[in-house]
């Protein structure tokens, strides 16, 4: 009897997910977004039910936490929108690098 019980125990489904931080680059219909992760991969993100029911707005340029499955790394669930003061702007750093390159080439 105890052997069957051990076989039926379910593992925590959250263990199969990895959490990343990313930047929303494009808003798509039906609560879908393109998100650029910290490692520069772009994935499709959808809003979790808790965020949807709380009516939290997610816009382009927002930093978000996203859960990605280990089995399908092309899609993820947006679980948290980071406050603007805590977020470091990836776009700003890349734009400033581009500006430095342009000004260096003019000299």
From Swiss-Prot:
It is found in: Plastid, Chloroplast. GO terms for cellular component: chloroplast; cytosol. Keywords: Chloroplast, Initiation factor, Plastid, Protein biosynthesis, RNA-binding, rRNA-binding. Its main location: plastid. It comes from the Eukaryota. One of its GO terms (molecular function) is translation initiation factor activity. Residues 8-83 form the S1-like domain. Pfam families: eIF-1a. Belongs to the IF-1 family. NCBIfam families: infA. One of the essential components for the initiation of protein synthesis. Stabilizes the binding of IF-2 and IF-3 on the 30S subunit to which N-formylmethionyl-tRNA(fMet) subsequently binds. Helps modulate mRNA selection, yielding the 30S pre-initiation complex (PIC). Upon addition of the 50S ribosomal subunit IF-1, IF-2 and IF-3 are released leaving the mature 70S translation initiation complex. HAMAP family: IF_1 (MF_00075). Component of the 30S ribosomal translation pre-initiation complex which assembles on the 30S ribosome in the order IF-2 and IF-3, IF-1 and N-formylmethionyl-tRNA(fMet); mRNA recruitment can occur at any time during PIC assembly. This is Translation initiation factor IF-1, chloroplastic. The gene is infA.
């Amino acid at each position: 009897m105890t052997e069957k019980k051990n076989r039926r125990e379910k593992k925590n489904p959250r263990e199969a997910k990895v959490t990343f931080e990313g930047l929303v680059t494009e808003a798509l219909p039906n609560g879908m977004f393109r998100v650029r992760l910290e490692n520069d991969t772009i994935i499709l993100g959808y809003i979790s039910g808790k965020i949807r029911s709380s009516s939290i707005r997610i816009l382009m340029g927002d930093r978000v936490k996203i859960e990605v499955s280990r089995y399908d790394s092309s899609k993820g669930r947006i679980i948290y929108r980071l406050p603007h003061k805590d977020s470091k702007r990836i776009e700003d750093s890349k734009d400033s690098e581009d500006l430095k390159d342009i000004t260096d080439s003019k000299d």
